[in-house]
Amino acid sequence: MAKNKEIRINVTLECTNCANNSQKSSRGISRYITQKNRRNTPNRLELNKFCPYCVGHTVHKEIKK
């Protein structure tokens, strides 16, 4: 039987450097879409990912949709 809520959900990760500098001359905001397991990671997800706008690895945090 299927449960009411799915365990794995899709989340969006956004670059923290690009989000903070959005008012300045930034070309855009880097975003990644990934999945997380609700049981194993109930808190917000934070990962180091490559940002093409910052040209380096930065912290990407989970955002609300």
UniProtKB/Swiss-Prot annotation:
Pfam families per record: Ribosomal_L33 (PF00471)
Keywords, in A-Z order: Chloroplast, Plastid, Ribonucleoprotein, Ribosomal protein
Places the protein is found: Plastid, Chloroplast
GO cellular component, one term: chloroplast
GO MF annotation terms: structural constituent of ribosome
Primary site of residence: plastid
SUPFAM superfamilies, sorted: Zn-binding ribosomal proteins
Signal peptide: none
HAMAP family referenced in this protein's UniProt entry, alphabetically: Ribosomal_bL33
Protein name (record): Large ribosomal subunit protein bL33c
